[in-house]
């Protein structure tokens, strides 16, 4: 038994989707924020990795 693909409404199958120009600027900002956060985490780990890991260990079944 052959199944048919559901048809999409709003555009033809041949037509590529419209690019989102505003999304590109946001992606760069998010990438920069992520890089800054990762740099901060690296700094903490370099200074005191053992304490960083201990802060995430559950105590007493919490």
Swiss-Prot record:
Subunit description: Strongly interacts with the proteasome-associated ATPase ARC through a hydrophobic interface; the interacting region of Pup lies in its C-terminal half. There is one Pup binding site per ARC hexamer ring.
Domain notes: The N-terminal unstructured half of Pup provides a signal required to initiate unfolding and degradation by the proteasome but is not needed for pupylation, while the C-terminal helical half of Pup interacts with ARC to target proteins to the proteasome.
Cross-link for Isoglutamyl lysine isopeptide (Glu-Lys) (interchain with K-? in acceptor proteins), residue positions: 62
UniProt record similarity statement: Belongs to the prokaryotic ubiquitin-like protein family.
S-S bridge residues: none
Record key words, sorted: Isopeptide bond, Ubl conjugation pathway
Segments of this protein annotated with the region Disordered: 1-34
Protein name: Prokaryotic ubiquitin-like protein Pup 2
Pathway(s) this gene product operates in, as recorded in its UniProt entry: Protein degradation; proteasomal Pup-dependent pathway
């Amino acid at each position: 038994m052959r199944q048919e693909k559901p048809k999409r409404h709003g555009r033809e199958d041949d037509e590529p989707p419209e690019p989102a120009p505003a999304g590109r600027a946001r992606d760069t900002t998010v990438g920069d924020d992520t890089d800054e956060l990762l740099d901060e985490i690296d700094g903490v780990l370099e200074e005191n990795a053992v304490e960083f890991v201990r802060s995430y260990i559950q105590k007493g079944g919490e």
